[in-house]
């Protein structure tokens, strides 16, 4: 019986190949749910249980998320804005509500910081800056990039935590000059900016943990590549299998 089974062709051979290609193409960043969505986008008719079973049998396991957040809050040093966003993470129009934050990496013995700005409508990263110091100029630069790229209409909103960069007059002035509204999370409440925290979790799992970067320049290039991939290729379940740019 077992000899006969071994001689029979594998009825899932083509599906296994498609699964492996999806997994490899996306640099081991996809678990079975996103592989399933990718396959369905290609025209495969298959259920999640089979994809899960085959990926386990093939030893294909996505990278595991690790969390160790950078904390920019150092107390109330200036102005604390109201939590105007109030966890309304699903605006009905593009270029109306943005979120931002800072996260920290260790690269070639140095601390490196990333400041992205996300449009909550499609969860795309519309601007980002990388620096070796989490300064006010560094965070303001990413917001200035976002304003230039998106040209939001008066009344747009930017939400952050209570980090010192966002209490600073330079950040507040930039918002008011472009007729925006500042919103801040409540003290110590990461869930008020959960979408950006979630992005950081995916980014660190999918392009940072387990990788080695010899220089900050090499790391910067990897960040640029990841954000391009995230915006144009990475499938999102909340977007029903589409990418932010689709």
Segments from the language model and where they lie:
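Charged DNA-binding/catalytic regions of mobile-element recombinases
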Residues: 1-246
């Amino acid at each position: 019986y077992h000899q006969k089974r071994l001689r029979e062709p594998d009825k899932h051979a083509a599906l296994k190949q498609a699964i492996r290609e999806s997994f490899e193409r996306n640099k081991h960043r996809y678990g079975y749910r996103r592989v399933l969505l990718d396959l369905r986008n290609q025209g495969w008719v298959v259920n999640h249980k089979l994809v899960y079973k085959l990926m386990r049998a093939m030893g294909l396991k996505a990278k595991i998320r690790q969390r160790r957040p950078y904390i920019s809050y150092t107390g109330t040093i200036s102005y604390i804005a109201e939590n105007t966003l109030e966890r309304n993470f699903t605006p009905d129009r593009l270029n109306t509500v943005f979120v931002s934050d800072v996260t920290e990496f260790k690269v070639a013995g140095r601390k490196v910081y990333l400041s992205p700005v996300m449009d909550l409508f499609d969860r795309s990263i519309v601007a980002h800056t990388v620096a070796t110091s989490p300064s006010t100029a560094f965070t303001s630069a990413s917001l200035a990039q976002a304003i230039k790229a998106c040209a939001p209409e008066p009344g747009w909103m930017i939400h952050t935590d209570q980090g010192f960069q966002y209490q600073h007059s330079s950040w507040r002035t930039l918002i008011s000059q472009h007729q925006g509204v500042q919103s801040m999370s409540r003290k110590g409440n990461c869930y008020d900016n959960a979408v950006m925290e979630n992005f950081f979790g995916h980014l660190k799992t999918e392009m940072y943990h387990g990788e080695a970067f010899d220089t900050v320049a090499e790391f910067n290039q990897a960040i640029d590549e990841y954000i391009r991939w995230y915006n144009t290729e990475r499938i999102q379940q909340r977007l029903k299998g589409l990418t932010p740019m689709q």
